[in-house]
């Protein structure tokens, strides 16, 4: 008989930071806890003190913040890796795969419980940014990819947010089973705003607003977007680019550029803003955009879609599975194409409204409250059916086929 209330371990180096991975982990943990299951979060520097479900439990593992602008925390809980006192756990859900992931693997083996891994951000793309000297050396070859494969291969199955992300992992020889399901967005993003009034606060009255909600990091290419917007502004004189989001390695460069005379009248940076303001900006913006060639999913696009705002983004990993080209927005292969698509939508109010309605309808499938219910089914399946096969050393092909058959009956999950 299946256990009615599960004790689920969430393992991540990111939880309280302001970025897509941290949001995905935090919102899912809260949504599962709201269903009555115990979620135990093992993460460094967790910010406590806010109202949360009684079944959401925080376990501090220690860490040092080495990049205050991004909130990146280096955590190496060596003293905990081989000593697990949490024998109540039923399953481990691992969200980051370096040292904390290794700890979770060791604990799971010691406890004899299954483990699932969500693969959001490839370490290969971020190590050089957050660990500047050693990281640059490590990313010159495929050492980091091989390390991730070594860890991920130990999981009962791997979860990714989009099909294009699965294709990327398969290109780097990650093994099946790999299942695709959105990380989901918080139900609060669907709030029906009766009053907005946000344009006055951010000096956007009478403007056609392109919103770029993102951390200011090189992989998000904010500088490229600012420069191409200068050309776009010539075609639409009342167009305005508003950047919002947490600080990152590109923050100072962005601030310097937008102070220049040729940009300051039609580009602004608001920094990290309160959630109510972000929600109102998603609602009032004419368009949102995201220009990144490697995304787990592109949650900021989904958040805007929940408020009925269409998007233009890079035709790349993650984003290409979120924007439905010609229906909820456009996918661009280069910046010139990006510029043309933005101009087209800003000039055509009817088309933009149609795309916005489509976007809001599509976004309904991404509510994290519904995604959490699917996760409970996956956890129970893994505990009761999949893990026993791995424990008894059944061949991988048998396990892959079992996963493929099971997810046929689940909403929003594909193989």
Task: Give the location of each predicted region.
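N-terminal subdomain of nucleotide-sugar transferases
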Residues: 1-49, 53-57, 398-415
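Donor nucleotide-sugar binding/catalytic pocket of nucleotide-sugar-dependent glycosyltransferases
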Residues: 43, 59-62, 138-194, 204, ...
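Conserved donor-binding/catalytic core segment of Leloir-type glycosyltransferases
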Residues: 203-229, 242
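Nucleotide-activated donor-binding/catalytic signature segment of Leloir-type glycosyltransferases, i.e.
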Residues: 253-276
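Short alpha-helical donor nucleotide-sugar binding micro-motif in glycosyltransferases
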Residues: 272-273, 280-285
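Aromatic "clamp/platform" in nucleotide-sugar-dependent glycosyltransferases that forms part
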Residues: 293
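Short hydrophobic beta-strand element within catalytic cores of glycosyltransferases
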Residues: 310-313
